[in-house]
Amino acid sequence: MWKRVHLITLSEFFGLLASNPFLVLVMVLILGTIFVNGATDAANAIAEVVGTRSMDIDDAILMSVICNFVGLVAMTFISTAVADTISGMVDFGGDSHLAMIALAASTVGIVAWGVAAWIFGIPTSESHALIAGLTGSALAVSGGLDGVNMGEWVKVLYGLVLSTVLGYLAGWIIAKIIPIACANADRRKANNFFGRMQIAGAAGVALMHGAQDGQKFMSTAMLAIALSVGKTVGEMGGFPLWIEVLCAATMAIGTAIGGKKIIKKVGMEMVQLDKYQGFSASISATISLFIATVTGLPVSTTHTKTAAIMGAGAAKDIRSVNWGVCKEMVLTWIFTFPGCGLIGYVLAKLFLVIF
């Protein structure tokens, strides 16, 4: 784990920007990916609490904004395992200029992919887009697999299985147990109770989204800064508080501006949930994300939460799930890795010629 030593101040960062215009471009692109992540992944984290009408959509977005910020900052104190995995996943080589070009190429692809998915209201995974884009651009710069740390990539595959399988199964099991456990309870009181618990569960997912996705993209921002001064991320000493605030604020703005489209797709169109099912989905996703975060597995919040919602919905009646909407999402997930990897590779090759 990195020591929390602030070796670069905000004023020093502005000095780097003033002397390195390409760093300005790369940082703008990285903040663009964080913005898109806020509009898609962060919004998906609170979708079902709106779908069950436990919260108004504007109140849910405000809660998401606050919890994402707290999750990002708090988890940086507890564990940076996910950030370590992301920063160690690729090696752009010793030439910092080539490395910055590769990083710029990968972020352009991530933004383009994320915006396209957002236009259609499909909650794609910016986490997997980030991983694929970085890998594609690293392959382009290194000319082969030397630029990819396969040991860290294995963690991505483990995380992919965890996020979908564990999320779905946990959502299904908890949604099956609750009706049995509450069979003799007053229906109205139980409904009110699970409505309140669902809000708490959604807050937990938003916290873990900040912890997971916030670390991923914050480590990318630190990677850009490190490359601009010819260092590795580990040599930078840690995450300054100002970069945590910058990343969290950018994600929050993305959720506030673009979150409603994704919330409506997942929370209202994919499946209609009762409040206890919404709670089942939220608590399942929170547990899955926490396990992944502390073990350093870079998982997709989108995959985890959506799979949990599917499982909770199918537990009551498999026909209640709109499998047509699910198909759209799954196809987007499947194409994210090869699509963003190819875009990152092609753009890196193109940028190498131009710059």
Feature annotation, model-predicted:
Residues 2-355:
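Multi-pass alpha-helical transmembrane bundle typical of ion/small-solute transporters
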